């Protein structure tokens, strides 16, 4: 256990703006919470330079065969698992490319296992279980910036030469000093003292969204602002796939449905076939040559 006193942490401080939250009407209570929530986006904005550095590192790692691994305990761990689990259906990547590891294992997603966060060795074991290597990126998430489980992971990753990123909500935390890149949106005291699932959790979610989304954009998973590597695995996503191709190409539904059927609902390939007027085999060859970047593939044939 680290020796940082909790009373020195911003996230554990008492919020003077909400000290009467238990004595006001419901609407006033919610206004208090909402006023605090408004501070979150501003805190994240102040960290954009550091977030950009992290996105560039993650994108570079992806292009070189690396992965993005999140580690955290409690709410922080759950947020990592949540962000990771959304990447395959949204961007068509493997479930191994972005992974979330929570202290205490899968059961900790649904039932708190708070004691698991106190072990540095447990995180090292968890990282070894997923074959974490020097080409991978480790993002350690903890509102306090002092969680032993996460610190153990960051230290291990540093030791094998991997890039490390910390996402915390306390300035000058131990994690911030260990990680290669520190992201620390300081959201201030919580509406309910110490309840870091609130503002801190929201800030962490926003940062993780930026990290994964930014890296996917950097690696050609987005064309314009369209998710062109979407996997059409249900009726809603089938319709979304059709709309994406229509929006990207300006083509009518009938043509889009025909091309999507030909490509087995490969959205990116369908778009490039329409934009290039090439057949499936030639279009795929050029796309593959350009590592899936539609813009670069179009430049090649222009």
Curated annotation (Swiss-Prot):
Uppermost EC category: lyase
Active site: 86 (proton donor), 117
One GO BP: N-acetylmuramic acid catabolic process
PROSITE patterns per the UniProt record, alphabetical: GCKR, SIS
Reaction it catalyzes: N-acetyl-D-muramate 6-phosphate + H2O = N-acetyl-D-glucosamine 6-phosphate + (R)-lactate
Pathway note: Amino-sugar metabolism; N-acetylmuramate degradation
Pfam family, one: GKRP_SIS_N
Residues in SIS domain copies: 58-221
GO-annotated molecular function: carbohydrate derivative binding; carbon-oxygen lyase activity; ether hydrolase activity
Keywords linked to the UniProt accession: Carbohydrate metabolism, Lyase
Top-level taxonomic group: Bacteria
Enzyme Commission number, as recorded: 4.2.1.126
InterPro entries hit by this protein: Etherase_MurQ (IPR005488), Glucokinase_regulatory_CS (IPR005486), MURQ/GCKR (IPR040190), SIS_dom (IPR001347), SIS_dom_sf (IPR046348)
Oligomer status and interactors: Homodimer.
Family: Belongs to the GCKR-like family. MurNAc-6-P etherase subfamily.
Protein role: Specifically catalyzes the cleavage of the D-lactyl ether substituent of MurNAc 6-phosphate, producing GlcNAc 6-phosphate and D-lactate.
Additional information: A lyase-type mechanism (elimination/hydration) is suggested for the cleavage of the lactyl ether bond of MurNAc 6-phosphate, with the formation of an alpha,beta-unsaturated aldehyde intermediate with (E)-stereochemistry, followed by the syn addition of water to give product.
Name of this chain's protein: N-acetylmuramic acid 6-phosphate etherase
Source organism of this protein record: Clostridium botulinum (strain Okra / Type B1)
């Amino acid at each position: 256990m680290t020796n940082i006193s909790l009373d020195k942490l911003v996230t554990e401080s008492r919020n003077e703006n909400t000290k009467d939250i238990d004595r006001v009407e419901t609407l006033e209570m919610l206004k208090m919470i909402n006023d605090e929530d408004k501070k979150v986006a501003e805190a994240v904005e102040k960290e954009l330079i550091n977030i950009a550095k992290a996105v560039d590192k993650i994108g570079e790692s992806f292009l070189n065969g690396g992965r993005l691994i999140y580690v955290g305990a409690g709410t922080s761990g759950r947020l990592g698992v949540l962000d990771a689990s959304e990447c395959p259906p949204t961007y068509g990547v493997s479930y191994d490319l972005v992974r979330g590891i929570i202290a205490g294992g899968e059961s900790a997603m649904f039932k708190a296992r708070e004691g698991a966060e106190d072990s540095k060795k447990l995180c090292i074991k968890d990282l070894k279980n997923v074959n974490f290597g020097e080409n991978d990126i480790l993002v350690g998430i903890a509102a306090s910036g002092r969680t032993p489980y996460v610190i153990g992971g960051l230290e291990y990753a540093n030791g094998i030469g991997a890039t490390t990123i910390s996402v915390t909500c306390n300035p000058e935390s131990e994690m911030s000093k260990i990680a290669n890149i520190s992201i620390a949106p300081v959201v201030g005291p919580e509406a309910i003292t110490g309840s870091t699932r609130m503002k801190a959790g929201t800030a962490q979610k926003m940062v993780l969204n930026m990290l994964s989304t930014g890296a996917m954009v950097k690696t050609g998973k987005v064309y314009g602002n369209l998710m062109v590597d979407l996997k059409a695995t249900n009726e809603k996503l089938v319709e979304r796939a059709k709309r994406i191709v229509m929006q990207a190409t300006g083509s009518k539904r009938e043509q889009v449905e025909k091309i999507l059927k030909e490509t087995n609902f490969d959205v990116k390939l369908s778009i490039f076939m329409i934009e290039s007027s090439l057949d499936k085999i030639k279009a795929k060859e050029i796309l593959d040559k350009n590592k899936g970047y539609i813009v670069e593939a179009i430049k090649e044939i222009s």
